[in-house]
C-alpha cells in the first residue's frame, strides 16, 4: 500500500450558476501572467504543437490559435455531439506525426436512441475542417455526470483514455465494463498485447471520474480523480491495479486496493482535471478548487500557484511555460468579461 499524504487545504468554495451578465474583467492576479486568447466557449482540452494551439470546446468545435489569431474550426462527426450537463467534445490529442498526417484523436459524447455513450475516434484536418475518420472504441458508458474524457499519448506511444463511472458506481469494479477505468490502446485502436487483462482495453480500474494523466521522464504515470463531494485524489497509476472506488476513497485503505499519493481529505474539494508535470512536480487544474495546484513528489507538499481566475479545466507545459484554460462558462462558474480564456505564465514566475 502506497504512502497516503492527506492534504489539509482550507479552501472554501461554492457552485455558482452561470449568469448572462458577466462581471467586469479584473486585473490578472499573478505577475507575468498573460492572456493568449479569450471568449472561448466551455473549452476542455489544450494541445500545443510548435507555435499553434488547438483547443476543444464542449459544444463540438476545435479552436485554432496562432499568432494571436483565433479561428473556430468546425468538426464533422458521424454522430451528433451531446452537450447535456458534462457531455460534449472532450478529450483531444494530436497524433505524433500530425505535421505530416493532420491526424488527431478525440473523445466525444453522443446519443443513440434513449441511450448515451462516449466514443474515441480519429479526426483528420482538411481545408480547415476536422472530419471523423475511424472509430477506435465505442459505447464507453455515459450518463449525466462522470464522463472522464481525457486522452493522452503515453511515452510508450499508446493512446490512453480516462473513462468515468457514468454515475453508476458499481461498474468501476466490473472488468467487463469500460466505465470507471483508465483505458489503453494502440494508435490504430487495437488492444495492446501487453495490457494487464488479456483482450481488454482496461489498464487500471476502480476509478470514479478520472480527468487528468501525465508521465514523468522515467515513464511513471499519474492521474487525477474526482472524489464523491470531497476526497479528490492524485494517484500513481500502475498496470492492472485497483484504485478502490466505490469500496474505498481518499485516505481509506483495503488490501488489494491502491490508495492515493495525495487526497484533498474529507472537508475540501479540488475537482481536479487536466494535469502535467515539470521537474518532479505535478501541476493540476482544479475546477471547484478554482486554482492551478502544484504537488511536490519529493516533499509531499502542495500549494495553489494560480488563483483568482475561477474554474480551471486543463493545463499543459511547454518550453518552461505553463498554459491553462479557465472553465467559467460551463454553467457552474461565475464568468468574468471575455471568459473563457487561455493563459500563459513562465514557470519561473511561480517559484
Where are these regions (language model features)?
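Acidic, Gly/Ser/Thr-rich repeat motifs that build Ca2+-stabilized beta-propeller blades
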Residues: 20-163, 220-223, 270-302, 320-333, ...
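Conserved catalytic/binding loops enriched for acidic/polar residues
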Residues: 12
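Sec-dependent signal peptide recognition
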Residues: 2-8
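Generic cytosolic/nucleocytoplasmic N-terminal low-complexity/intrinsically disordered segments
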Residues: 1-2, 20-21, 210
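Short, surface-exposed beta-strand/loop micro-motifs that present aromatic residues
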Residues: 149-150, 313-315
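Beta-propeller domain segments
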Residues: 82, 87-89, 97-99, 166-304, ...
Amino acid at each position: 500500500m502506497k504512502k497516503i499524504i492527506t492534504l489539509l487545504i482550507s479552501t472554501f468554495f461554492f457552485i455558482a450558476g452561470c449568469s448572462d451578465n458577466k462581471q467586469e474583467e479584473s486585473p490578472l492576479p499573478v505577475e507575468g501572467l498573460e492572456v493568449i486568447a479569450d471568449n472561448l466557449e466551455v473549452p476542455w482540452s489544450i494541445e500545443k504543437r510548435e507555435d499553434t494551439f488547438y483547443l476543444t470546446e464542449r459544444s463540438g468545435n476545435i479552436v485554432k490559435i496562432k499568432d494571436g489569431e483565433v479561428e473556430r474550426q468546425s468538426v464533422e462527426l458521424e454522430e451528433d455531439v451531446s452537450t447535456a450537463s458534462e457531455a460534449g467534445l472532450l478529450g483531444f490529442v494530436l497524433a505524433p506525426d500530425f505535421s505530416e498526417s493532420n491526424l488527431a484523436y478525440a473523445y466525444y459524447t453522443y446519443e443513440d436512441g434513449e441511450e448515451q455513450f462516449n466514443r474515441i475516434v480519429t479526426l483528420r484536418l482538411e481545408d480547415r475542417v476536422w472530419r471523423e475518420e475511424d472509430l477506435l472504441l465505442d459505447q464507453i458508458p455515459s450518463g449525466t455526470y462522470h464522463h472522464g474524457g481525457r486522452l493522452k499519448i503515453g511515452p510508450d506511444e499508446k493512446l490512453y483514455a480516462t473513462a468515468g463511472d457514468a454515475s453508476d458506481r458499481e461498474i468501476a469494479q466490473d472488468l467487463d465494463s469500460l466505465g470507471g477505468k483508465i483505458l489503453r490502446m494502440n494508435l490504430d485502436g487495437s488492444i495492446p498485447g501487453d495490457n494487464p487483462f488479456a483482450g481488454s482495453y482496461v489498464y487500471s480500474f476502480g476509478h470514479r471520474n478520472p480527468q487528468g494523466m501525465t508521465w514523468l521522464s522515467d515513464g511513471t504515470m499519474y492521474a487525477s480523480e474526482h472524489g464523491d463531494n470531497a476526497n479528490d485524489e492524485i494517484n500513481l497509476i500502475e498496470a492492472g491495479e485497483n484504485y478502490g472506488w466505490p469500496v474505498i476513497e481518499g485516505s481509506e485503505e483495503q488490501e488489494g486496493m491502491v490508495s492515493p499519493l495525495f487526497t484533498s481529505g474529507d472537508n475540501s474539494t479540488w475537482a481536479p482535471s487536466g494535469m502535467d508535470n515539470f521537474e518532479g512536480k505535478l501541476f493540476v487544474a482544479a475546477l471547484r478548487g478554482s486554482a492551478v495546484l502544484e504537488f511536490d513528489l519529493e516533499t509531499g507538499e502542495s500549494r495553489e500557484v494560480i488563483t483568482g481566475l475561477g474554474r480551471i479545466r486543463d493545463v499543459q507545459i511547454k518550453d518552461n511555460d505553463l498554459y491553462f484554460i479557465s472553465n467559467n462558462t460551463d454553467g457552474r462558474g461565475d464568468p468574468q468579461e471575455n471568459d473563457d480564456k487561455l493563459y500563459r505564465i513562465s514557470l519561473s514566475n511561480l517559484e
